[in-house]
Every structure is written in structure tokens, then in C-alpha cells.
Amino acid sequence: MLMKVSDVMTKNFLAVGPETPIYKVQSLLIRYHLNDVLVTDAENKLLGIVTFSDICCKLLPDYNEFMKDSSYLLNPELIEDRLADIMHLPVKQAMTTNVITTEPDSFAIKAGALMTAKKIKQLPVVENNRLVGVISRTDITWGLLLKYCKQVPD
């Protein structure tokens, strides 16, 4: 029988509410060595995901802005000012809302193939519009190794 997402997904996950300040999310990313944090509402409905990249996009000027405004070169403190401005914004202003997800009854191999195709490391697992876990490529690999490599030669 093929392994399902529910067989190997992580049920303990970190999520924040949409009004959580970016500085708190940044602290969680650093403290727990995460690449992203899920954003849910009070009923655990997945609203989005926020990544280091999302925060960087808010913090750094885009290329056109940088080229038009030389003040970033002349006054590097502008980045610090910009950082101070965005750190208190709610995470909903930085998160990605179009999140690729999977379901607990999906085949784990299918979820792994989706992650590989989309170049992402983990997928939120959603059931009945509620976040129930996350699955990573590592979860799938470990699951396969444990299932099919019962005995490893010395």
C-alpha cells in the first residue's frame, strides 16, 4: 500500500495569526531555524505563509526603486529606517496568500513530486479547509527509508 501524506506529516507545526507583527515572526524564524511560518485564523484556516524572502521583499528596495533613488547609496541608514517601519506591520501585509497545499489522504509520493516541481521544501496539509499539519521532502524521505529499508547493511 502506498504511503499517504497523513502517515508521515508533522502534526505539530508553528502558525501565527494575521495580525502578528513581522518582528515576532522574524524572531520565530530565527529562534527555530525556520524558512517560513504558516498564517492561520482562529479556526485554523490557512490564510497564507510568510518566508524570509517575503520579509526581504518588504525590507529591501526593488531594483527599479534602488536605481531611481540614489539616497540608498548615500544614506545606508535608510534601510535601517525602512526596517523599523516594517517590523511592526502585521504579517498579513507580507505573507503569500496563494499557498500550494496537499491533503492527508493524498499519496506522499505525489506531494513529494509537487514539492520538487515547485521547488519548495514543505507543504501545508489541509483538511476541510483547516490546517492539520505540514509535510516536507525530508518527512517523505524518512518515511520511505523506514518503510523500504528495514535492514541497512553495515
Question: Locations of the language-model features?
Answer:
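Short, charge-rich, low-complexity interaction segments located
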Residues: 62-72
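Structured functional modules or segments
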Residues: 120-121
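Short beta->alpha transition motifs characteristic of CBS
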Residues: 34, 38, 46-61, 124, ...
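Bateman/CBS regulatory modules and CBS-like beta-alpha motifs in cytosolic regions of diverse proteins
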Residues: 1-28, 34, 39-42, 46-47, ...
